[in-house]
From Swiss-Prot:
Region ranges (Uridylyltransferase): 1-324
Cofactor: Mg(2+)
Protein name stated in the entry: Bifunctional uridylyltransferase/uridylyl-removing enzyme
InterPro entries in the cross-refs: ACT-like_dom_sf, ACT_dom, HD/PDEase_dom, HD_domain, NT_sf, PII_UdlTrfase/GS_AdlTrfase, Polymerase_NTP_transf_dom, UTase/UR
Species this chain originates from: Burkholderia ambifaria (strain MC40-6)
Domain HD residues, every copy: 443-565
Keywords, sorted A to Z: Hydrolase, Magnesium, Multifunctional enzyme, Nitrogen fixation, Nucleotidyltransferase, Repeat, Transferase
Comment field on protein domains: Has four distinct domains: an N-terminal nucleotidyltransferase (NT) domain responsible for UTase activity, a central HD domain that encodes UR activity, and two C-terminal ACT domains that seem to have a role in glutamine sensing.
Stretches assigned to the ACT domain: 682-761, 790-858
GO biological process, one term: nitrogen fixation
């Protein structure tokens, strides 16, 4: 609100009248859903209200009240800002300022979100020359009331000063910068209907630059001008109508300006469009898929239009052309262009050839507007006959098998909808959301991200990112096999049933149709079937157990299959979300790969031989650090076999060096160091064991914003706990070396206290978890040997969750022998190895599971 006197009774009456009229319009929109009528009606209602206030303020006829921006277009969304310009003559009485201020205050009193400026014509032109945002808002200026002559003078001066070329360049740059803020993709899980790529702002930008150039201000006018076809104009109008309706519905549902399609509103928005949940898809998923298809079409058509407008504004002076494929394609100014509009109709196999040429031709940076338009209008050509054409199948395999350019080619094939036309099952997952709380991309974008990750392993310029993966793929024969597996690993998502099993059938059919036979075909199908296996073993099973390794090695069978699965697994996890991958998961996978490779090479997965090997390596490292030869014995004699199998040689050596003088310490020994794997802190705790120890340590981590990635808990023969934790700081850019000493001091002090365990903090769930909560699950069962109990917990992630679990265990005197903490984006799947004499009692098991479910409940 403006800083003026409280509204008068008359102002309050007008406000109520305005509010009632607006509410009536919104109610009609709820039932009729005619967004154009609503936006124009809201604009007229606002015009009439502002005219009355203008008249009441007695502003002279020499001034003009101008609507600018979306309001100037006559398109007001329910809770949009109302942007106005009070246009002054060059010579005006400064005494008018108070009346203008009163006018703006009274406009606010109506309940309008006013964005106002007060300028002369000269000031408008000056401001517009300095700021393209001002220039854009003035482009659609419309007189509401006041001097017609003054407004006409402004219009003439504005267009005289407007440089269409400079405006085009500025708006395209602005659009690129805006797209970059949204990661250059329309496929955000919470898109901004107005600002995201493929949103309303893209459509407005095109009409702005067309209007500035004098080409027209509507899709019909651009069609008449020849910049788009009648069909394209129809598509643009249809998608624009959908996006405007969606935005208006969001405003109405939220009761305020709301342009972001957030999780909380997706279901209500979907229901307002008449979508209803089915067994396979939520209502919100159906709406989002429609949104993504609309945004994708807008992105395609916007690219065509911008290139066409650019060609008219900046006619080429040196059209250097080279023939790339006789009678089909030429290169024109770095773009791949068809020789005429009938190429794809005469030669349907040229459709895929376009992407192969784009991929292999140096200097070609994209497809020209003419080529993009021809592709867009060739949908009927891409039919079953086209898909079955042996030449097309050969070309598709050539695209997959090139040494470079694969990722760019496939992204472009998806953007132009050619990929989904060629692989019909891929088309089914375009725009398919994944509500599993750790994928942040739609299924099609995730698949292309996995393909991109595999390709980066193979490109020398990126070898520093994941050197081990780059080394492996460099020695992997026919890496295109991995790319095919990547295309199919999630292709059956959203169909109901096991997507790995359904995807196998799709992959098998693809191999048969594309001449992939023998071991290559078998490997592709096997990878699709088992693409989750390695991550499940590495993150959820005890890989220090030789039996686990033996079973995994039997599933894999040979080195080629192991390497392929490892590379696909790393690429897959990294393609889910930037949050899900971390160096600790990378180490778990690499360790599993190396141990399994040794077993496949003939090494015996025997605990005794592995223990002996690690001890010898650890002793060699201790000698390098000048630890006396027999100094380790006092500690090692107290440790069981499990300790040596759970830690590698370097870790054993570090812990021995820290503890060999303190085997019978009376107070807690706490040591912390930056984790050798990076991006984490390793914390060692050595103290006399007690039932609440694990919970007490977790309480400290919880209170200090440290997230536990892994916990390895050992108990010595003489009753000491030797616990190791890998933790990360929730704050970014933390230097773990700087906080190591603080953690040592604070945690040692905390362990010396005898205070009862504090209440767990009830951390807030993220919006994603609140909107898509998962059912918490707790499973407690004895292990195969009956020595320990395995506790599996899955729940929405939140601060304090691990401590909540540990506290329940401590209250029942249940000791934690090992813990595998597995955070998958917004979801956790934790596994604990428990010891506790009473756990064989069924009543205790039921009580424990009940209390754990209560503790992890949202």
């Amino acid at each position: 609100m403006s800083a003026h006197a409280a509204p008068s009774s008359e102002a309050l009456s007008r406000r109520a009248e305005f509010k009632a009229a607006k509410a009536d319009m919104l109610e009609r929109f709820r039932s009729a859903a005619n967004v154009a009528s609503l936006m124009h009606a809201l604009s007229k209602l606002t015009d009439d209200a502002l005219k009355r206030v203008w008249d009441d303020c007695g502003l002279p006829a020499t001034l003009a009240l101008i609507a600018v921006g979306g309001y100037g277009r006559g398109e007001l969304a329910p809770y949009s800002d109302v942007d106005i310009l009070v246009l002054l003559p060059d010579a005006h009485d400064p005494a008018l300022d108070a009346r203008i201020e009163r006018f703006i205050g009274m406009a606010w009193d109506l309940g309008l979100e006013i964005g106002s400026s007060v300028r002369t014509v000269a000031q408008c032109i000056e401001e517009a020359s300095q700021d393209v945002t001002v220039q854009t808002s003035l482009l659609e200026a419309r007189r509401i009331v006041g001097s017609t002559a003054l407004f006409e003078r402004f219009t003439v001066r504005y267009h005289e000063a407007l440089d269409a070329r400079a405006f085009f360049t500025a708006k395209v740059l602005e659009m690129r910068q805006r797209h970059a803020k949204f990661q250059d993709t329309p496929y955000s899980l919470e898109p901004n209907v107005k600002e995201s790529p493929g949103g309303l702002r893209d459509l407005q930008t095109i009409l702005w630059i067309a209007r500035a150039a004098g080409f027209g201000s509507s899709w019909r006018e651009l069609d008449t001008r020849g910049l788009i076809t009648e069909r394209e104009a129809r598509e643009l109008r249809r998608n624009e109508g959908f996006l405007k309706t969606l935005r208006a519905r969001l405003h109405v549902i939220a009761g305020r300006r709301q342009d972001m399609l957030v999780f909380d509103l997706q279901t209500q928005a979907a229901e307002s469009f008449g979508y209803r949940p089915t067994q396979a898809k939520r209502a919100s998923e159906q709406l989002m898929r429609r949104y993504y298809w609309a945004a994708k079409a807008v992105t395609q058509l916007a690219t065509i239009l911008i290139q066409n407008i650019e060609a008219q504004l900046f006619p080429a002076t040196s059209g250097i052309t080279r023939v790339l494929s006789p009678d089909r394609f030429v290169e024109k100014q770095g773009m791949l262009e068809i020789v005429d509009d009938g190429v794809f109709e005469r030669h349907p196999d040229a459709i895929l050839e376009a992407f192969l040429l784009y991929e292999v031709t140096r200097g070609v940076k994209g497809l020209s507007a003419r080529t993009l338009r021809a592709l867009y209008n060739s949908r009927e050509i891409m039919n079953n006959t086209w898909r079955r054409d042996p030449q097309n199948r050969r070309t598709f395999m050539q695209i997959l098998q090139q040494p470079e350019g694969i990722t760019h080619a496939f992204r472009l094939m998806n953007q132009t909808s050619v990929l989904g036309r060629y692989l019909l099952n891929f088309r089914r997952i375009v725009g398919q959301m994944q509500h599993d709380l750790y994928h942040v991309y739609t299924v099609d974008q995730h698949i292309l991200m996995v393909l991109r990750n595999l390709r980066r392993f193979a490109v020398a310029e990126h070898a520093h990112e994941y050197p081990f993966c780059s080394q492996l793929i460099g020695n992997f024969e026919r890496p295109w096999v991995l790319y095919v597996a990547a295309l199919f690993h999630d292709i059956a998502k959203g169909r109901g049933g096991d997507h790995s099993t359904l995807g196998m059938a799709d992959a098998r059919r693809f191999c048969r149709e594309h001449g992939i036979t023998g071991d290559d075909a078998a490997l592709i199908v096997w990878l699709v079937q088992h693409h989750l296996t390695m991550s499940q073993v590495a993150q959820k099973q005890d890989t220090s157990d030789p039996e686990v390794i033996k079973r995994f090695a039997e599933v894999v069978g040979n080195e080629r299959y192991l390497t392929a699965l490892y590379l696909l697994t790393v690429a897959d996890i990294r393609g889910t979300s930037p949050k899900v991958w971390n160096t600790w998961k990378g180490k778990l996978l690499e360790d599993l790969y190396r141990i399994t490779l040794a077993v496949l090479g003939g090494a015996n997965p025997d605990a005794h031989s592995e223990l002996k090997s690690r001890q010898e390596q650890a002793l060699a490292l201790l000698r390098l650090e000048t630890v006396p030869d027999d100094a380790h014995r006092a500690l090692w004699d107290q440790l069981d076999v499990g300790f040596f199998l759970r830690h590698d040689a370097a870790d054993i050596a570090w812990q021995t060096r820290v503890l060999y003088r303190h085997v019978n310490a009376e107070t807690a020994i706490v040591r912390a160091r930056p984790s050798p794997i990076g991006d984490a802190l390793q914390v060692l705790v050595y103290v006399k064991d007690r039932p609440d120890l694990f919970a007490g340590i977790c309480a400290y981590f919880d209170r200090n914003g440290l997230s536990v990635l892994d916990a390895r808990v050992s108990t010595t023969r003489h009753g000491y706990a030797l616990d190791n934790f890998i933790v990360t700081q929730t704050e970014r850019d933390v230097r773990y070396r700087d906080i190591a000493n603080l953690v040592e001091q604070q945690l040692a002090t905390r362990l010396a206290e005898t205070a009862p365990l504090p209440e767990p903090s009830k951390g807030r769930l993220s919006r994603l978890s609140r909107t898509f909560p998962i059912t918490p699950r707790v499973d407690l069962r004895a292990d195969e040997r009956g020595q320990y109990y395995i506790l599996s917990v899955s729940a929405n992630d939140r601060p304090g969750l691990l401590y909540s679990i540990a506290r329940v265990l401590a209250e029942h005197q249940v000791g934690v022998h090992a813990a595998r903490i597995n955070t998958l984006g917004e979801r956790v799947e934790d596994i604990f190895l428990l010891d506790g004499a009473g756990l064989s009692d069924n009543r205790l098991q039921i009580q424990l599971e009940t209390e754990l479910l209560r503790a992890i409940a949202v």
